Amino acid sequence: MDKHGVKTPLWKKETEELRAEDAEQEEGKEGSEDEDEDNQRPLEDSATEGEEPPRVAEEGEGRERRSVSYCPLRQESSTQQVALLRRADSGFWGWLGPLALLGGLTAPTDRKRSLPEEPCVLEIRRRPPRRGGCACCELLFCKKCRSLHSHPAYVAHCVLDHPDLGKAGAAGNS
């Protein structure tokens, strides 16, 4: 909080602290020679006593100290996660299990009603072919069988009995 009792966001705090430290460092550079000599003497004295000398923070470390760090989430193995999920499911959803089984009974009957099976082309009464064509000469694709269907006497009719063939043959010969 600042002097007025207002909370300041972390990103503003960091910039303000950096500016203050930069100003201190500039002032410190002027008298740094005297301070360095004073700082080295106590460090040597404390090292002889067996204590660790205090670390002087570098620029990179100072920034890291002021920055917000996020701890990574702990990692669990997949088998542990599955076991935890099963325990959680059994507690809350365990009593719903029988009801869910009953709810699934109506679904297959609805599916049968909504998707009627298409009959084979040979089972359907066909309309007469368009453009005055011959019904015996038709080839039809059947979606149910996934193949082509034709009249049983297709070949004999088209080659031997077709009325148009006789007229075309007579016109071709003359």
Curated annotation (Swiss-Prot):
The protein depicted here goes by the name Uncharacterized protein C17orf50
Which stretches does the entry tag as region Disordered?
1-69
- Locate the transmembrane regions by residue number: none
Where in the sequence does UniProt note compositional bias of the Basic and acidic residues kind?
A: 1-31, 52-67
A single Pfam family it belongs to is DUF4637
Xref: InterPro entries: DUF4637 (IPR029174)
